[in-house]
From Swiss-Prot:
Family: Belongs to the CarA family.
Keyword annotations from UniProtKB, A to Z: Amino-acid biosynthesis, Arginine biosynthesis, ATP-binding, Glutamine amidotransferase, Ligase, Nucleotide-binding, Pyrimidine biosynthesis
GO-annotated molecular function: ATP binding; carbamoyl-phosphate synthase (glutamine-hydrolyzing) activity; glutaminase activity
Subunit text: Composed of two chains; the small (or glutamine) chain promotes the hydrolysis of glutamine to ammonia, which is used by the large (or ammonia) chain to synthesize carbamoyl phosphate. Tetramer of heterodimers (alpha,beta)4.
Region of interest (CPSase), ranges: 1-186
GO biological process: 'de novo' pyrimidine nucleobase biosynthetic process; 'de novo' UMP biosynthetic process; glutamine metabolic process; L-arginine biosynthetic process
InterPro entries, per database record: Anth_synth/Amidotransfase, CarbamoylP_synth_ssu, CarbamoylP_synth_ssu_N, CarbP_synth_ssu_N_sf, Class_I_gatase-like, CPSase_GATase1, GATASE
Protein name per Swiss-Prot or TrEMBL: Carbamoyl phosphate synthase small chain
Residues that hold L-glutamine according to the record: S45, G238, G240, L266, Q269, N307, G309, F310
Catalyzed reactions per annotation: hydrogencarbonate + L-glutamine + 2 ATP + H2O = carbamoyl phosphate + L-glutamate + 2 ADP + phosphate + 2 H(+)
Amino acid sequence: MRALLALEDGFVLEGRSFTGPGETGGEAIFNTGMTGYQEVLTDPSYAGQMVCMTYPLVGNYGVTREDMESGKVHVEAFIVKECCKVPSNWRSEISLPDYLKRHGVMGIEGIDTRALTRHLRIHGAMRGVISTQETDPARLVERARALPSMEGQNLVTRVAPAAPYRWDGERPQAVTLEPGGCAWVGKGPRLVVYDFGIKWNILRLLAQQGFDMLVVPPSFKAADVAAVGAQAVFLSNGPGDPATLKDEIAEIAKLAQTYPTAGICLGHQLLGHALGGRTMKLKFGHHGCNHPVKDLTTGRIEISSQNHGFCVDIDSLTDVEITHVNLNDGTLEGFAHKTKPVIAVQHHPEASPGPNDSRYFFARFRNMVREAAGC
């Protein structure tokens, strides 16, 4: 089925829908990973975005429940050069086209993904529309221009939970907080995890470190954290512009004064704001599992998994030590407060997909909690 992709600057490409008729729009970006498409699709940080995969063949190993990073597909559309319709892998439970159809997400192939990637790299990520219904490119360009910019969008409200829950090792489990606080179930440090659109592998790795976790929505106040008797705080990844989360930033500023605190991706950006810094929009973002990062505390070079369109301005922070930098463009990838037990990284140490070079971050956080809180 013929499909058109139109960007706000007038750039138009023709392809074919492999998920049936429809029309959708969002910010067009590219991901440089060779594999890991299912983790990309189910990563809540991709909400509001149409993802173009630079690798030419996608879908050849199908989809399995084991590789999900959330309970649904979050991308607005999936753009590939060629989609494999008949996967070959013993773990596969469903084909990529059928999986996208099940979740009501458009997928298109036959697109010149090299041309699209080059255009976005030169001109920057931008709004776009995909349609099988509208045949006039000029009308689609106008529809793309009418979409909201990623800057100024609070997309956390689309993906964050409405109520606290626990992680049972495989799926979230609802929990009701008692008026007197929280009935912790484990023996490890009591950790409140803020879910701004969390990837499940973060919860898996925190559990491996022995934390007794309560996962909470962004609306959970610092006073609520104290009421449940938490000993540490973790801030997750998530989508959209971090500067829009002003209420959450104010609460995080209070938490960072009291608890050992760590953040990943959006959590890193929110901590940056809470410590007096600012964020800025990257031209085309960092999306993929092959981004080099240097840990300045050890001198070690890591290949990291990344997915962010915003970053903390490295010159805007005071009272922190810069711990990680991106070797492609020199942007900030991690910091630690000079006097408080606060650490954060912009990249994704939990990977999924990607290498495990940065997984030590979770052990580093566990050791920090042990030293700061004595637990």
